[in-house]
């Protein structure tokens, strides 16, 4: 009995894995919903991380509150990376989610997954994962275009991005993503206040 309790407390139980899987699926759906207005348009696509960050806060924070263990957020980041790569996104988008998922997990762990402020910061960092593809776009547009052409993106779409993608957009994208993530997280805590109090989430 003691060994079972230790495993459940330290590692992820089957229930934790199922919970993580369910919330990852929801996170993926809301990421798509948040970005669907921006992604199809080569001029607005740079703002897709902002739209996605605006919707996923409550989902992320509720998952953290229900599991409250290391690796859950990491798994979310890895699964998001795999799914997005399979869907034809640039490899840097997937890598961004994986890396920021690990970092977000470590940050949330600093507050034992129970600190409201730390969890919000954790979510903000995770959302930066969605900017990975665009970072490569600005750093190496030629290589980015070659990869996306191989993934099936139309040349006209890429040309429009390169014509309209001024460097100042990168600043707006990063700052906007952080701001949208913070707003989404605060709204999530307001909407689900009772659930978070029950889970022992503190200020």
Regions found by a protein language model. Name each.
Residues 45, 120-193:
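Membrane-embedded alpha-helical hairpins and interfacial helices in multi-pass inner-membrane proteins
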Residues 24-32, 79-87, 125-135:
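Aromatic-anchored segments of alpha-helical transmembrane domains
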Residues 17-22, 50-54, 74-78, 94-95, ...:
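Hydrophobic alpha-helical transmembrane segments
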